[in-house]
């Protein structure tokens, strides 16, 4: 059955999931730095949720399901944060990479762009 709106369609496609603690897997030689740098960027998950929340305060399409989908995305960002923190704890992350990621996060927070643009760019470039 076809969903009433594209927003409802996207929301219906989402799967329920719960973050769980993990143990460190074995990484290929040379992959440790890549994984640690990626895990350090977990500090951007909550800001992405905040960008979405900020966007919900402004003009949104008056289409059924839009706000509900965005609200569910904020919850997803919180779950991503928990899951990535579990992975970071399991693998460990260099303080140097944490510092680099904090600088990147600060730069994004200070960027004077629409919150949806910031959320979309981060989701597409960092988390996918």
What do the predicted segments below correspond to?
Residues 1-128:
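Non-heme di-metal
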